[in-house]
Amino acid sequence: MANKLTLSKSKINTFIECPRKFKYRYIDEITEEANEYMLLGTEVHEIAEEIAIELMEGNEIEDVFLNLEYDEELEDHIKGLNKFFKDIYSNGYEIFSIEEYIVDEESNMNGIVDIVIKNSRDELIIFDYKTGKPRNIDKYKLELCVYKILLESKYLDLNVVSAGIYFTSSAAYRIANFGSHSGDYFKSQSKEDIDDSDFDYVDAVVDNLYETIDMNYFKKEKGFLCRYCFYKDMCDGDFG
């Protein structure tokens, strides 16, 4: 494992989207310029972290949001974050960690987990913020599996029972459960589960990714998204 590229959910998702794009970004290390959507995501994540820190220090939610400074175009995202943190505290949860960077040498993965909350039974629930429109949880199961692997590799005595996406602009949840657990506010919003087959899929993609690196052949996944790709011009000039 020591000689292999350390993976993250972003690297794995990029490989699934297009192996050639993966090569440009992570093998050739050609940095993609930040677009408006990336900048928005960064700004909302920073504000969410600021809010969480204030709340963990014992400040009241109303006071935190009253004193919050932000641009007007972020209004919907701020309203969404307000609901999210109220849901946490009004339903008996506490914030366990925020923006935690974890490295798991066994799986050869790393990543930053946006926020983890804990219920009264010391069970953990992972959330990842998204600033786009709500989408089906199936799109995000892979990265939620990665987050569970990372978190449980560090906190060996704790169990991650659920993981979800929170869409800040629409205050919408998409949550999946790792097995069954009862009596949770966030579980009641979900009818989805993540099972062994989802983790098997992660393993299969990772194996394919490393095989592709070893063969040094990164095929193009041609489709309508190509026209928006940062690497389009150089990709069009490549053969294969």
State each model region's role.
Residues A2-K4, P19-I30, E123-I126, D203-I213:
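Short amphipathic alpha-helical segments and their helix-coil junctions
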Residues Y37, I137-Y140, D195, F199:
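Flexible, glycine- and charge-enriched loops at secondary-structure boundaries
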Residues E43, L142-L150:
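Short amphipathic alpha-helical face segments that pack within enzyme cores
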Residues E50-R135, L142, K154-G164, Y173:
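Catalytic cores of nuclease domains that cleave nucleic-acid phosphodiester backbones
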Residues L5, K9-M56, E99-E100, Y228-Y231:
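Nuclease catalytic cores
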Residues L5, Y140-L144, K222:
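Active-site-proximal structural scaffolding
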Residues I30-Y37, K133-N136, N216:
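Short, polar/flexible loop-turn hinges at active-site or ligand-entry regions and domain interfaces
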Residues T6-L7, I78, E152-G240:
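Metal-dependent nuclease catalytic regions and adjoining charged, substrate-binding loops involved
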